[in-house]
Amino acid sequence: MQRLPRQIGMKNALGMMLTGRHVSAEEGMKLGFVNEVVEPDNLIEAAKNWAKQIEQCSPMSIRATKQVAYENFNEPDLEKSMKAKYSAVGELFGSEDFIEGPVAFAEKRLPNWKGK
């Protein structure tokens, strides 16, 4: 109940919460709390595609992204959140992965993430 209004707006959230109305996957996608709609037979393949896309990123970058996103979810002050220090971001900046990304890009090859 606390997060839904932030994701889809107070009007839509209250409409759903006060009436108990269920929404279809398509409506959930239009409202912005569903990422993708697939046929049931394609569900596993779609989930694997999402996992494959995430897997291609640096593990340290994923960790830092999640930390910043979760820690700032309820922070209304953008300037404050931009100035905050995040341990995972600091670790990323000093890592081999931080160097590997631009090098791989410059060499036109896929990066070899080490997670360190």
Tell what function each PLM region has:
Residues A25, V34-K83, N112-K116:
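C-terminal long alpha-helix characteristic of the crotonase
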